[in-house]
Amino acid sequence: MQRFTDFYAAMHGGSSVTPTGLGYIPMVIEQSGRGERAYDIYSRLLRERLIFLVGPVNDNTANLVVAQLLFLESENPDKDISFYINSPGGSVYAGMAIYDTMQFIKPDVSTLCTGLAASMGAFLLAAGKKGKRFTLPNSRIMIHQPSGGAQGQASDIQIQAREILDLRERLNRILAENTGQPVERIAVDTERDNFMSAEDAVSYGLVDKVLTSRAQT
């Protein structure tokens, strides 16, 4: 997955973009009887139960997403959470931390692709509550097998190879469950980078609906 993340960074000037890493984050001023209060835009949207994954999946972004999921569950365990994804993917381990938390908490997590959901980004997109997984019409979704490198003694390389194969089998099995596709087809379709349009992603079972307006939600 690192290979595609590097390509994504090159297409964006060599830098990764996350909500916490932007040079400028808009502020929202709210007025009440107690006076004015300023929020950064992402904190304000968190109050509306919106979470964003923007840029590569790594330990830092996973930690932020997991913390927000747990916080929103504690605020209201019966109200849906909306998870907006625009990500080229990244670390399988970090992504699985997000995935497991999505399944662990009580609220339904609705997912929406805005731009790109590739690799682990696509995996998390498909992990939303069935019937509540969406994409915008010009988004792109890409699935592929996990990748990684190893160095050291032959025994060390063998251990890493077994781990990658185990991860591939685990990811394929979960993706098959979430899409309704046979695991054998998942294995074939993820052999190389497999890009899909929004409509193709619906047909494949990665998402449930293409949204063109807010009224459709």
Curated annotation (Swiss-Prot):
It catalyses: Hydrolysis of proteins to small peptides in the presence of ATP and magnesium. alpha-casein is the usual test substrate. In the absence of ATP, only oligopeptides shorter than five residues are hydrolyzed (such as succinyl-Leu-Tyr-|-NHMec, and Leu-Tyr-Leu-|-Tyr-Trp, in which cleavage of the -Tyr-|-Leu- and -Tyr-|-Trp bonds also occurs). It is an enzyme of class 3 (hydrolase). It comes from the Bacteria. Transmembrane segments: none annotated. Its EC number is 3.4.21.92. The active site is at 119 (nucleophile), 144. It is found in: Cytoplasm. Cleaves peptides in various proteins in a process that requires ATP hydrolysis. Has a chymotrypsin-like activity. Plays a major role in the degradation of misfolded proteins. Belongs to the peptidase S14 family. This is ATP-dependent Clp protease proteolytic subunit.
